[in-house]
A protein has these predicted regions:
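Hydrophobic beta-strand positions that form the internal "hydrophobic ladder"
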Residues: 11, 64, 108-112, 166-169, ...
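Beta-propeller domains
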Residues: 13-44, 72-75, 172-297
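Short, solvent-exposed loop/turn segments at conserved positions within beta-propeller repeat blades
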Residues: 18-21, 73-80, 113-114, 204-208, ...
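Short loop/turn segments that connect beta-strands within beta-propeller blades
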Residues: 30-33, 86-90, 124-127, 216-220, ...
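Predominantly five- to eight-bladed beta-propeller fold
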Residues: 33-35, 69-74, 78-81, 132-160, ...
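Blade-loop segments of beta-propeller domains
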Residues: 33-71, 96-101, 278-282, 287
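Short glycine-/Asp-/Thr-/Trp-enriched loop segments that recur within the blades
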Residues: 44-52, 139-155, 230-235, 279-288
Length: 297
């Protein structure tokens, strides 16, 4: 996967070097298409003997979050081990084991992630973890990660987002308690299959009850957003605007023919509808990662 650098003149690619049998993250020049640098090579990093599955830059592009030992869950979701790599010093440190969706804060000082259905924050300077939610439980409560329906129908996994000033995290909570269960045999490496049971609402059955929450990093407090005006609804996307105190949230009814775009106040959790879309048939949600906020919001 090609990733454009912020200088706009270069891009990075995860390559496999046949000669050294090594995975490496290479930097290329857009104008010449020639390689100009190699950021990291697995042949020089014993901790990455299992390879590199994916990587993400911090906002200043001085650090990399590198995933390996990935284990799939559903179509898009997976858990993985994660390493923090400092490009200038070439220092590599394993910081997280079998977690989901670790994401740098915009200021590059923290990493939010989900482990066993709860949200945590890793502080890079102090190398400490703090827990945001505590009620996560398999097949009951999910914080910050989508359930099967959202992953399959709305094509996203990470259900949390950092504010632009790195002071808040907005996240969706899924209560799957009343969703019917489905079991299936999984044939893996073992001699006999194992049975996996997960929440799977068929047409007309109960969906997860979703709620929207705002976490303040400094005060370590959480506010629940009042969405009581809606009934049997989805929250198919959340995204902080350019204003660090305004979260946008899309609210879609179950018939998927009525969509509200809300602005949520990051301090009071008050909401207002800034856009409504209706359709006699249904609202096409194939590509709804399409919000662009201007500089003045």
């Amino acid at each position: 996967e090609l990733q454009s650098m912020k200088n706009t003149n270069q891009y990075t690619v995860l390559n496999f070097d046949q000669a050294s049998r090594s995975l490496q993250i290479d930097v290329f020049d857009f104008a010449t298409l020639k390689k100009v640098n190699t950021l990291i090579e697995t042949k020089n990093q014993s901790q990455l003997s299992d390879g590199i599955d994916s990587y993400a830059f911090s906002s200043d592009e001085k650090q990399l979050l590198i995933a390996n030992n990935s284990n799939p869950i559903y179509r898009h979701s997976f858990t993985a081990d994660y390493f923090l790599y400092t490009i200038e010093t070439k220092g590599l440190t394993k910081i997280l084991e079998q977690v989901q969706e670790p994401t740098f804060s915009p200021d590059g000082k923290k990493i939010a992630y989900v482990k066993e259905n709860n949200i945590f924050i890793y502080d890079i300077a102090s190398k400490t973890n703090s827990q945001i939610t505590t009620d996560g439980k398999k097949n009951e409560i999910i914080n910050g990660i989508t359930d099967w329906v959202y992953e399959e129908e709305f094509a996203f996994v990470r259900a949390f987002d950092w504010s632009k000033d790195s002071k808040k995290i907005g996240y969706i909570r899924f209560d799957e308690t009343q969703v019917p269960e489905f079991s299936m045999s999984v044939f893996a490496k073992e001699l006999y299959p194992k049975v996996e049971t997960f929440k799977y609402p068929k047409a007309g059955e109960k969906n997860s009850l979703v709620s929207l929450h705002l976490y303040n990093v400094d005060s370590k407090s959480t506010k629940k957003v009042d969405l009581s005006q809606y009934n049997d609804f989805y929250i198919p996307r959340i995204e902080w605007t350019n204003d660090g105190n305004i979260l946008s949230a899309k609210i879609l009814n179950r018939h998927q023919d009525n969509l509200d775009l809300l602005f949520v106040d990051g301090t009071t959790a008050a909401t207002k509808v800034v856009l409504n879309e209706k359709n006699k048939s249904y609202i096409d949600f194939v590509d709804k990662d399409n919000l662009t906020f201007l500089a003045d919001n």
